Regions:
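Substrate-binding cleft of secreted/luminal carbohydrate-active enzymes
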Residues: 311-322, 340-388
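Mature N-terminal, pre-catalytic/accessory segment of carbohydrate-active enzymes
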Residues: 19-141, 146, 150-152, 176-178, ...
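Glycoside hydrolase catalytic-domain groove-lining segments
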Residues: 259-346, 362
Length: 751
């Protein structure tokens, strides 16, 4: 039976019928798989004490345990080529048993590309699964079914093949059903690739004469139907694109893999049925816009947890940046020479691409943040180099790095579950970009958008890319005083009320960020969350959108005032304010409302109020972001790190003090994973690597970072650094360590 694509508005209407039943919060100590049938135990949630705004839960909820694919919560993935596919015959210089028998190749998931780049005349698809594949690929795929490894399929016309967006769709659903049954280890079908970026490229090139008249007509129809400056129109445009891709992939929600790059559309895909989410990270961008890999993890992991689906990480080592001579270079990419004939210069350039260091670091970063798989792009070109001694191909430095990383994951399979106690709640129509800024990259920039940027550019600081790139500074991952302890959830997806609340109730604290339309359902969901023990950070703008004094403990008088200079917290500490903030005047609606912040004139800037078992923190400065006159200028200054957000910084710092179990001091990036018998605390030093687009990386030994860790209430019986294997001396619940530039340290803390 042919299935129909369901549009966003239909899904949203179906989800609007909510109910107000209580949602139990389940937790346990340790880690497993959400699909593994764990017996969940209901536990009472702790209550925030005096001087706290949130109560920590160190025993993670069952929902945050890592999901498993074919019995494991992590797989390395390679596309089918040479060593990664045992069905491929190795010959000549590639007949290298030492490489072929490496664990990363003997024990990996395989991605199969069908290979065909044409379609039957007038059709948008091939009718049967088998018709998509060349016989040689199909033969390998048939044999791979016995390997006991997960397989991912990419049909051709592949997900980015434009002619597939028009033409008749005539599919044999019985054939597809039989194919799936015959290949039970196919765990994903890549339905779309670089979703948001691809859509922009299509629309901007809609009149390209290389497209057929039918294709140009379809692109212009979609372009004219939806406004590029209306975020909800852009949402509909994105769903048109996704629904077409689902249609030509049999509308299969069981194996629906959604792959995106620069726009973080993970929640949209999961709401529409995706069961695997993939984040692509790369080093492309312009002189101001930067791929911010750390922020990407907050979105995709949050979506996976909200919808209880799998997620993976895809690493593309392309780099847009300055050459050492000051010229700009696009799509610089590393490649090692494998040519035997040295009389001909190799076209491959091992000095190009992102640095060896950041490519290695991001693998550990993704693994530690919970990715169920990591896939390297173009590894066939940068993992191998010709070895004149053996006359065979051997591993390049990047190949050795990845092999060592894979071996680490095999030696330490119990990484625990990433500890992320704070949910940042953003609207579904945000279309948030890896470099922040305007919704979808084109919609007018609003103060509410500035609030979202304020949060993420405080957690992962902006930096002057224009200046630092010219000096060879790389970026992509960022040191920060804030822990990687935040997930992004989306309240207004077409998800059942009870399912969303199950997801949200797993987080001790949440921040309502951005412009959520006024909605009784949103108010109801937030009240439920707080009444059951959660802490909600609420901006005063929402006092005019249905959140009243009974919930917040304060009312807006209707008057406004300007805050600048400084503010003082309830501990008597003064904090600097740069810029001007428009604030709503607040008056207590209850004697139980406690003032947290006041400006220099004694006016209320933030309050704490207990509602049910939880707490509402109301922040007066509108959108917690400074006033601006030009949205474009505000975006650029934010990206370059020229704007600070002191109210976001204060709230995030206060939540971290209450919720993160460790205190880490020193210039680094860090996070924690909860395990059965303790913790992993991981630390990265992203400084000290100079990388031009046309030169090998240079490591500055002077950029080592001395860190100090206070274990707080965690009683450690032993601490060991896992990558180097050293025992760490702990004195008075504290220890020190030096992280070399561009390196990673993982501390196993046994309780």
């Amino acid at each position: 039976m042919k299935m129909k694509s369901i549009g966003f508005m239909a899904l949203l209407a179906a989800a609007a019928v909510g109910c107000s039943e209580k949602t139990e919060v389940k937790s346990a100590c340790g880690c497993g798989t959400a699909a593994g049938g764990h017996e969940e135990k209901t536990v009472s949630r702790p209550v925030a004490g005096e001087g706290e705004i949130a109560a920590a839960r160190l025993d993670l909820p069952e929902r945050h345990f890592l999901r498993k694919t074919m019995g494991r919560d992590y797989w390395t993935y390679f596309y089918s080529w040479k060593f990664s596919d045992p069905m491929v015959k190795l010959e000549g210089i590639w007949d290298s048993p030492e490489v072929a028998n490496l664990p990363m190749f003997k024990d990996c998931g395989i991605v199969y590309w069908s290979g065909k780049l044409h379609l039957p005349k007038g059709k948008g698809v091939w009718r049967t699964v088998e018709e998509n594949f060349y016989p040689s690929v199909l033969e390998k795929l048939e044999n791979a079914g016995t390997l006991g490894r997960p397989l991912t399929l990419m049909f051709h016309p592949k997900c980015r093949y434009l002619p597939a967006l028009v033409g008749e769709v005539d599919l044999d659903y019985d054939n597809y059903k039989a194919f799936k049954k015959k290949h039970p280890n196919i765990t994903a079908v890549r339905v779309q690739s670089e979703w948001g970026v691809e859509l922009v490229q299509i629309m901007l090139g809609r009149n390209d004469k290389r497209h057929s008249p039918e294709l140009r007509a379809k692109f212009n129809e979609i372009y004219d139907r939806y406004s590029w400056t209306n975020r909800y129109d852009r949402l509909q445009q994105a769903y048109w694109y996704m629904n077409r891709h689902k249609e030509i992939h049999y509308n299969d929600n069981e194996l629906f893999e959604s792959f995106r790059s620069a726009n973080f559309l993970d929640h949209m895909a999961a709401a529409a049925g995706a069961t695997t989410l993939v984040s692509e990270t790369t080093g492309t961008g312009d002189r101001v816009q930067e791929y911010r890999w750390d922020v990407s993890s907050m979105f995709i992991r949050g979506a996976a947890r909200q919808f209880d689906v799998d997620w993976r990480w895809y690493v593309a080592g392309y780099f847009n940046g300055f050459k050492q001579n000051g010229e700009w270079m696009y799509n610089s990419h590393c490649g090692y020479p494998v040519e035997v004939d040295k009389s001909k210069p190799s076209k491959r350039r091992p000095e190009c691409g992102v640095s060896d260091s950041v490519e290695r670091r991001v693998c550990y970063f993704a693994y530690l943040n919970g990715a169920g798989g990591i896939e390297m792009e173009a590894w066939g070109g940068n993992f191998f180099v010709y070895d004149e001694k053996t006359g065979k191909v051997g591993l390049s430095p990047r190949g050795r790095n990845f092999s060592d990383f894979h071996d680490f994951t095999a030696a330490h399979p119990d990484r625990g579950a990433p500890y992320a106690p704070v949910a940042v709640l953003v609207p579904i129509a945000q279309g948030y970009n890896t470099c922040g800024g305007k919704a979808w990259g084109f919609c007018p920039y609003t103060p509410a958008d500035h609030m979202i940027d304020g949060i993420f550019f405080t957690l992962c600081p902006g930096w002057d890319k224009r200046t630092l790139y010219s000096k060879g500074r790389e970026g992509l991952l960022h040191n920060s005083k804030f822990a990687m302890m935040h997930d992004v959830l989306v309240p207004d997806t077409p998800q059942k009320r009870e399912d969303f609340l199950k997801a949200l109730d797993c987080y001790p604290a949440a921040i309502l960020a951005g412009d959520h339309p006024a909605s009784e359902e949103l108010v109801s969901r937030m009240k439920h969350y707080v009444s059951e023990g959660g802490t909600l950070v609420l901006n005063s703008a929402y006092l005019e959108r249905g959140f009243g004094g009974d919930f917040t403990g304060v009312d807006a008088t209707g008057s406004r005032f300007e805050c600048s200079g400084s503010f003082t917290d309830d501990f008597g500490k003064t904090h600097e304010v740069k810029g001007e903030y428009d604030c709503l005047e607040l008056k207590p609606a209850s004697s139980a409302a406690k003032v947290l912040l006041r400006d220099g004139k004694g006016r209320i800037l933030a309050t704490r109020f207990r509602y049910g078992k939880g707490i509402v923190v109301t922040v007066s400065p509108l959108w917690m972001a400074p006033r601006f006159t030009s949205g474009d200028a505000a975006v650029v200054k934010t990206r370059l790190g020229q704007i600070r957000f002191p109210f976001a910084e204060y709230v995030l710092g206060r939540l971290q003090r209450d919720l993160f179990p460790f205190k880490v001091e020193g210039d680094c990036q860090y996070g924690a994973n909860r395990r059965k018998d303790g913790w992993w605390l991981w630390v990265m030093n992203n400084n000290g690597i100079t990388k031009y687009a046309d030169r090998h990386q240079i490591v500055d030994p002077a950029a080592a970072s001395d860190i100090s860790v206070d274990l707080g209430k965690v009683k450690a019986s032993k601490v060991r650094e896992l990558i180097g294997g050293s025992e760490i001396a702990v004195a008075g619940g504290k220890f020190d360590f030096t992280v070399k530039p561009g390196e990673v340290a993982i501390f196993e803390i046994a309780e």
